[in-house]
């Protein structure tokens, strides 16, 4: 039962009329209000602008922090990166009419060593920089021996030297001498880890400059084998990212190590095929990233080498020029034999479906796998005016005299690169399945428009070699070559 309540009507207080302000005071009040609004707007814009500036500065300073999702583009690199192609041209190999000339590999290496201040990291396959290593007495070994001497001088002058090398089954004298000089060396047992080898070839100096290319730590790679690589100067953004690949090798070089099921985040990268690094390269805007093989050695964000290579092939619309020592659409070292057409299919599709001009310059020497010839002939057979498929294959043979023929494992074109109208790919692997699925390798990919950049320089090198007298059609007589080419 509700209690009986007494309600009393409340009286709303009546507002007394306010006195009206004089007209001049009203105008003054409106002007002051307008001014206050403008001041507030300026303050808000200043705060927002300052916040944006500090955010940008933070990203520049702490670019390696994990601040981006998988599809967010990282901040550009503002280093004045300079790329220089470097080559080893074997003694006796001349291009008299060529307009393309690049610094030598030994010149570039010695320059990097002379300029090293704090650190040098080297990822390598094997070490034979002296005549003693190869049981030879060749004057041309002098360049390799000088490189070794300069390497030995680094640690005593305060440079931290780290060397990751494939677990060797050959000479150790160079590595032992470097250990004695104060360098650190770790041997990576890729055979145990992935049934492959550490085939990578790169240097990182002061986390600012780097070399990446086909040259091994071998005196023959400086004077008796044709090599190609790139030196990147003043490009700490890319150099630090390459150091992450080295750190993976360094980690795996520890005793009892194994490949992590998930790599620690410190190995991750933000730069890959989907989000390449924006850089200024030789004064021109470019996109770049580093890829790695095999896939188990690719932490989060790292594009596998094969995926990167195939993306270059699939993106080409005009031409694809390839220079590589070995080309085999097989798992070269597998037993039983396995067909592996990943790259082969991409090249055939590019030529047939998109009308892309494909050129392959394959090396031929005394150690070439004879089975390559059948696969190369199969590719070349697609050259047809009716289908408008334009694939051509040539063999590059380094001329050899009697004394040079006595140098073991020399006198070969060891290049491993590709160039299209859009991109350049410089790697460390031969083009067969095992190199991408089991063996450790690294590649640099750069997309750059215009002339004078890395891409156009690489194209010029390819055309120089393609049009040289050292390049031969597959139907060339073996007798006319005068070398131990096993593919003719």
UniProtKB/Swiss-Prot annotation:
Record PTM text: N-glycosylated.
The residues the record assigns to binding Mg(2+) are 436
Q: Which residues form the active site?
A: 199 (proton donor), 201, 206, 414 (nucleophile)
Q: Which domain of life is it from?
A: Eukaryota
Which residues does the UniProt record annotate as the domain PLD phosphodiesterase? 194-221, 409-435
Check the record and name the InterPro entries matching this protein: Diverse_PLD-related, PLDc_3, PLipase_D/transphosphatidylase
- Which positions are glycosylated? 97, 132, 234, 282, 385
SMART domains in the record: PLDc
The protein's pH behavior is summarized as: Optimum pH 5.5.
So where does this one cross the membrane? 39-59
**Protein residues bound to phosphate:** 199, 201, 216, 414
Q: Which organism is it from?
A: Mus musculus (Mouse)
Under which main EC class is this enzyme filed?
A: hydrolase
**Name of the featured protein:** 5'-3' exonuclease PLD3
Where is this protein chiefly located? endoplasmic reticulum
UniProt entry tagged with the keyword Zinc = no
The molecular function GO annotations come to: metal ion binding; phospholipase D activity; single-stranded DNA 5'-3' DNA exonuclease activity
């Amino acid at each position: 039962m509700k209690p009986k309540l007494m309600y009393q009507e409340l009286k709303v207080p009546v507002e007394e009329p306010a006195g009206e302000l004089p007209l001049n005071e009203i105008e003054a009040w409106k002007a002051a209000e307008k001014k206050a609004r403008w001041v507030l707007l300026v303050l808000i814009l200043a705060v927002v602008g300052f916040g944006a500036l500090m955010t940008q500065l933070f990203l520049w300073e702490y670019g390696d922090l994990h601040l981006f999702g998988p599809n967010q583009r990282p901040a550009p690199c503002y280093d004045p990166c300079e790329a220089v192609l470097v080559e080893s041209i074997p003694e006796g190999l001349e291009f008299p009419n060529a307009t393309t000339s690049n610094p030598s590999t030994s010149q570039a290496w010695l320059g990097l060593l002379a300029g090293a201040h704090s650190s040098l990291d080297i990822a390598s396959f094997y070490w034979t920089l002296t005549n003693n290593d190869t049981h030879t007495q060749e004057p041309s070994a002098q360049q390799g021996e000088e490189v070794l001497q300069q390497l030995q001088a680094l640690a005593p002058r305060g440079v931290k030297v780290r060397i990751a090398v494939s677990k060797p089954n050959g000479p150790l004298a160079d590595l032992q001498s470097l250990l004695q000089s104060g360098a650190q060396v770790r041997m990576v047992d890729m055979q145990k880890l992935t049934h492959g080898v550490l085939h990578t070839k790169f240097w990182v100096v002061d986390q600012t400059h780097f070399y990446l290319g086909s040259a091994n730590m071998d005196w023959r790679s400086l004077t008796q084998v044709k090599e190609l690589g790139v030196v990147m100067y003043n490009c700490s953004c890319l150099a630090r990212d390459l150091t992450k690949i080295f750190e993976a090798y360094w980690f795996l070089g520890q005793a009892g190590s194994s490949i992590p099921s998930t790599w620690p985040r410190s190995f991750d990268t933000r730069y890959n095929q989907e989000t390449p690094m924006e850089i200024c390269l030789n004064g021109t805007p470019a996109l770049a990233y580093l890829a790695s093989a095999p896939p188990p050695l690719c932490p989060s964000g790292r594009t596998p080498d094969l995926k990167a290579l195939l993306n270059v092939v699939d993106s080409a619309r005009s031409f694809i020029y390839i220079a590589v020592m070995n080309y085999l659409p097989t798992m070269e070292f597998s037993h039983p034999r396995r067909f592996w057409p990943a790259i082969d299919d991409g090249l055939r599709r590019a030529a047939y479906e998109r009308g892309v001009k494909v050129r392959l310059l394959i090396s031929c020497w005394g150690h070439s796998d004879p089975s390559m010839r059948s696969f190369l002939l199969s590719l070349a057979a697609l050259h047809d005016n009716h289908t408008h498929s334009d694939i051509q294959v040539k063999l590059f043979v380094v001329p050899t005299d009697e004394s040079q023929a006595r140098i073991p494992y020399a006198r070969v074109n060891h290049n491993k690169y590709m160039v299209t109208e859009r991109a350049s790919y410089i790697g460390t692997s031969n083009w067969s399945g095992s190199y991408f699925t089991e063996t450790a390798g690294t590649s640099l990919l750069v997309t750059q428009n215009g002339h004078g950049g890395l891409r156009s320089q690489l194209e010029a090198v390819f055309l120089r070699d393609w049009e040289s007298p050292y390049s031969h059609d597959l139907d060339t007589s073996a007798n006319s070559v005068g070398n131990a080419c096993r593919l003719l």
